[in-house]
Amino acid sequence: MVPGELLVDDGEHPLIPCRRTVTLVVRNSADRPIQVGSHYHFAETNGALDFDRAAARGMRLNITSGTAVRFEPGQQRTVELVDFAGSRTVYGFRGDIQGPLDAGTAETAPGLPQQP
């Protein structure tokens, strides 16, 4: 063994086991590309991204840390989201939440605009 060497079993290894995930279809209705980073609260992304924001509350992209997904104008793609962990408190982003994610359900919690 070499110092720092990692010995990994064969096969696939989930990066984030035991956390809820959801798959959503997202469409960019803007005339410019929109890029979303790995740890951005997905429900608070650019308003030109069309998807179920209530379903995305408290979730981020299930991608490797430090990476991003780019949505070209008019592009529709399917993404997998994963629950935020830790204290599940969100500040910043677009300023829609500013506190605990679990203060209520997606339908009653303050912050996110409701879909028509």
UniProtKB/Swiss-Prot annotation:
GO molecular function terms attached to this record: urease activity
Pathway membership: Nitrogen metabolism; urea degradation; CO(2) and NH(3) from urea (urease route): step 1/1
Pfam families given in the database record: Urease_beta
Region feature Disordered, mapped onto this chain: 97-116
Location of the protein in the cell: Cytoplasm
Keywords: Cytoplasm, Hydrolase
GO cellular component: urease complex
Domain of life: Bacteria
Catalytic activity: urea + 2 H2O + H(+) = hydrogencarbonate + 2 NH4(+)
CDD domains reported in the protein's UniProt record: Urease_beta (cd00407)
Documented EC number(s): 3.5.1.5
Self-association state and partner proteins as the record states: Heterotrimer of UreA (gamma), UreB (beta) and UreC (alpha) subunits. Three heterotrimers associate to form the active enzyme.
Entry's family note: Belongs to the urease beta subunit family.
Name of the protein this chain belongs to: Urease subunit beta
